[in-house]
Amino acid sequence: MALLQKTRIINSMLQDAAGKPVNFKEMAETLRDVIDSNIFVLSRRGKLLGYSINQQIENPRMKKMLEDRQFPEEYTKSLFNIPETSSNLDINSEYTAFPIENRDLFESGLTTIVPIIGGGDRLGTLILSRLQDTFKDDDLILAEYGATVVGMEILREKAEEIEEEARSKAVVQMAISSLSYSELEAIEHIFEELDGNEGLLVASKIADRVGITRSVIVNALRKLESAGVIESRSLGMKGTYIKVLNNKFLIELENLKSH
């Protein structure tokens, strides 16, 4: 298969993924097929975002790493010493992706390390490994292009997370600002009583203790529930079960108290 055709396969993977959640496993499989090697996509902290095996490596330690989806911390940190593509590292290299305890079995093992860069930051590392056949220029072009695509997807995922965080915070702030002074006071007492993300509340007890009407508590809870910040369920005489759905709510409530 020609280089241009292989590049187009990577392109189509990117186009197919547009707007969908990132699937690093599919990315690894595509790169495996076009480069004909084992592929490991690592995050900055060594989490295995995706991988695909072309040539099996029968080794208990490697098997556990794949199951745990985590590469050793020391190895991951050492990868940051490689600022640009480093190809055809042999079994004796500290960066080898082959188990050194089986050096005799993987004597012909070659590893290529490609930094994943995005927005000027090191986002992770793309590791390629195979037996015997050296990685040639075409392989390295595809690997670097693949790393760029992976970097773009990591950045997109991060941007979506930041957007979701901002949206959650805005919803909470709007919900809290819709509360009257007495309703806000009631909510503060309710969540002091719950002491966590969920629990059972007896509205009449809090109303008596704080000196507010039960209807103020009911209205406050209704406003938060309609905003999707909490969910509540009446359990009759036992009280009302409350669960926080938006993880920004308790943080914002705490911030209000400290001001």
Curated annotation (Swiss-Prot):
Residues 203-222 bind DNA. The modification Phosphoserine is found at residue 215. InterPro entries: CodY, GAF-like_dom_sf, GTP_trans_reg_CodY_C, Transc_reg_CodY_N, WH-like_DNA-bd_sf, WH_DNA-bd_sf. One of its GO terms (molecular function) is DNA binding. GO terms for cellular component: cytoplasm. It holds the Pfam family HTH_CodY. SUPFAM superfamilies: Winged helix' DNA-binding domain. HAMAP family: HTH_type_CodY (MF_00621). DNA-binding global transcriptional regulator which is involved in the adaptive response to starvation and acts by directly or indirectly controlling the expression of numerous genes in response to nutrient availability. During rapid exponential growth, CodY is highly active and represses genes whose products allow adaptation to nutrient depletion. This is Global transcriptional regulator CodY.
